[in-house]
Structures are given as C-alpha cells and as structure tokens.
C-alpha cells in the first residue's frame, strides 16, 4: 500500500514537472525608442519606454546606431545610455545597453549560446555579455526581435579604476604582430590598439600593449615560455582557443574580442564578442559547416604557444578539452539543451520578426527559415565534435 502511494506521488510529481515545462514563458519585454530624430544619427536624445509584465518604465537616454559591416543591413543594432543605472530584462544593472539586431543569424542563438557557454566554462575568468531577448519598437512601430546585451566596460569587466594598469582594448590588432593593420582599418587615428579604457585623452595605454606585442614577436623561446604566463592568463586563453575550435569561429581568431587587464596584479584576459561566425555559418551568414576552419597560425600568440618547445601548451589544450567533454559542456546534449531553452523563449516571436524582415531579404545567402537554421546547428555539431575528438585525442 505504502509502495503504491509512493508511486502515485512520484507520478504526480513527474506530471507536475511535465506540465511546468510545457507552460509558456513570460512575454518578452519590449523596448520602445521614442525620439524626434532618426536613430541613425549619432547619440540623439530619446526616451526609453520599457514594458514588461504590464508595467511600464520611462527613462531619458541617448541612442546611436552601432556595428561595422552590419550597418549595411536595414535592421539596425543600437546602443543607448540612460541617465540612471537600471536592470532591464533581468540583466545586471547599468546605464548602457546594446540592442543587437541579430540580423545575419536567423537562429538568434549564436551570440547567446557562445557567451553563456564561455562564462560557464570558467565563471571567474571567462567573461562575456549577459544577454536577454526583447522586442524593439521605434516610436511605437514594431521593429523586430532583438538580443539585449550587457555592455562590456570597466564595471562589467571588474576593473580596479584606481589602478594605473587597469585597461581595456576592443578588437586590438595585437595578434597581427609585424603584419600591422592597414591604417585604413584603424578606427581612430592615434589609437592603433583601439583603447577603450581609460579614456585615451586621460592616459594612452597603446604603448603598453605595443611592448606586449613586441615581446611576442622578438622574445626567444625560453624567455617567451618563462614570461608569457605573467602577461596573459593562459587558462583563459586556452578556453578562448577551444571555444573558437568548437564553434568554428574563424573571425574570432584575430578580432571580435575585448582584451582587458583588471589591475597591476592580474594578467590580460579575453572577453569574447561577436559569434555570428559559428555553428556552421560564417560571419557574413554563408553556410560553411566545416569546409573552412580557423587558421591559428596567423595569430601571433597562439602560434607561438603551440610551437614553443619549452611549453606544454598543446598537452594543456588536450587536457582541457578532455575535461570539457567529460563534464558535458562540450557536447551535443549540452548545446541541444541551450537551443531548447532559447527556442522556448523566442519561438512565439520569430514569425513576426521575419514578417518584418523576410528570410530571403537583403544580405542573406539563402532563404533558410528559423527551424532550418536550428537544424544547421545540429548537423554542424554532428560533424564538428567527432573531428575535434580525433584532433585532440579524446576517447
């Protein structure tokens, strides 16, 4: 009798869990950018009207468009800075946020999955933007599904602003080495390494990073092996390296990251950024699967780490890969779970987005629909994981 009662209770618990998993998620928050001028103009005044669960909040802000190559698309990304620090969509409280149009990735998942995975690999050392899905309106007119992103800055990266060696660079060409970036691609003349913090007018840290690059170019193998772990956090670098391999992000080898140093006592670390190039698509949205793979030889740091006879970097890389596979973080099951969680959140919103921005619109290489993009990710994992297992000796 007791056994039957136990079984009945267990069945009720399972049914309750199943019912809970089938419940629809809460409606997505909406961000309405209200302004008299076009958001395509730089840093215009606006009001952010934030709606969530029937509650409305309004905050004065300044907004501007953002993005490099993505600016050619009609669906635009934005960044805005409010007068006060607020938490939007459950993200950490701050004044500045990014609204990523996510136009080229029709799954809306590449950035979020990669950022979440990188942080989970090592929460203390691997930083990336926290993200949430929102809908966006411009002056009350629906503009699509967006990814709201935490802005990476001195606060979110944990810098000690009182330390003279705290610094941030966005997409610094430090790994180009002697193949210096063509001046036409330098965004700010006089700021070759794209210093983000401190303000270059207050203190120019380009010389500091130039010295780091010169060390990587000229140090003999013995000196390089002895000193490189004091300059870069190699645990963080290995995780970055492996994530690039796992996702097949060739663009991310030389750019699409923040390089930051918290203070005098911590080495440089990488915070990842921009993973459109992932899970079977390249950075422009063209289908590639594993036809092309990242070229790590062109990255000054990774090339020297992999080929230094005094370092056991390749062994460490394989050991870390094994740990990630054994833990389940680098597995199809893990990514499938992340896909399901994100799909549950946005599935009811993608159709309207693609009514506004058709799947065969400007800039797309094909007319794959949302469901087909998810299938691309799954097929990619079926190909890539066995490749990496063989390459890195995982059994």
Residue ranges and their predicted role:
Residues 23-113:
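Conserved NTP-binding catalytic cores of kinases and kinase-like/nucleotidyltransferase enzymes
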Residues 79-81, 97-101, 108, 135, ...:
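Structural recognition of the beta-strand scaffold that forms the well-ordered cores
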Residues 2-11:
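Bacterial N-terminal signal peptides that target proteins for export
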Residues 57-61, 68-69, 73, 201-253, ...:
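Middle-to-C-terminal accessory/interaction subdomains
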Residues 19-21:
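C-terminal motif of bacterial Sec signal peptides marking the signal peptidase cleavage site
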């Amino acid at each position: 009798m007791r056994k039957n009662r136990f079984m009945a209770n267990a069945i009720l618990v399972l049914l309750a869990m199943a019912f809970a998993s089938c419940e629809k998620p809460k409606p997505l928050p909406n961000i309405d950018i209200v302004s008299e001028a076009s958001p395509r103009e730089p840093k215009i005044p606006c009001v952010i009207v934030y709606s969530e669960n029937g509650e409305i909040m309004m905050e004065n802000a300044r907004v501007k468009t953002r993005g490099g190559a993505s600016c050619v698309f009609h669906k635009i990304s934005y960044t805005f800075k409010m007068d006060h620090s607020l938490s939007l969509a459950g993200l950490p409280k701050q004044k500045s946020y990014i609204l990523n149009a996510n136009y080229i990735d029709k799954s809306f998942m590449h950035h979020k999955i990669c950022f979440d995975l990188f942080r989970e690999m090592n929460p203390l050392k691997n930083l990336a933007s926290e993200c949430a899905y929102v809908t966006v309106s411009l002056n009350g007119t629906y503009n699509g599904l967006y990814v709201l992103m935490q802005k990476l800055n001195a606060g979110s990266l944990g810098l000690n602003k009182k330390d003279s060696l705290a610094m941030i660079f966005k997409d610094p060409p430090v790994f180009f080495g002697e193949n210096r970036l063509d001046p036409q691609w330098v965004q700010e003349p006089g700021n070759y390494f794209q210093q983000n913090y401190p303000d270059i007018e207050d203190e120019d840290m380009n010389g500091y990073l130039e010295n780091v690059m010169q060390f990587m170019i000229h140090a003999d193998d013995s000196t390089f092996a002895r000193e490189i772990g004091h300059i870069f956090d190699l645990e963080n670098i290995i995780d970055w390296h492996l994530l690039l391999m796992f996702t097949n992000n060739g663009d991310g080898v030389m750019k699409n990251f923040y390089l930051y140093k918290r203070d005098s006592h911590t080495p440089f670390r990488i915070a990842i950024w921009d993973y459109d190039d992932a899970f079977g698509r390249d950075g422009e949205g063209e289908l590639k699967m594993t036809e092309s793979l990242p070229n790590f030889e062109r990255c000054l740091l990774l090339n020297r780490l992999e080929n230094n006879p005094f370092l056991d970097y390749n062994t460490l890389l394989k050991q870390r890969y094994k740990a990630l596979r054994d833990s389940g973080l680098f597995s199809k099951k893990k990514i499938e779970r992340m896909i399901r969680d994100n799909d549950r959140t946005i599935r009811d919103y993608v159709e309207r987005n693609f009514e506004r921005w058709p799947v065969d619109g400007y800039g797309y290489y094909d007319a794959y629909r949302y469901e087909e993009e998810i299938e691309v990710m799954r097929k990619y994992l079926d190909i890539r994981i066995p490749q990496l297992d063989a390459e890195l000796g995982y059994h």
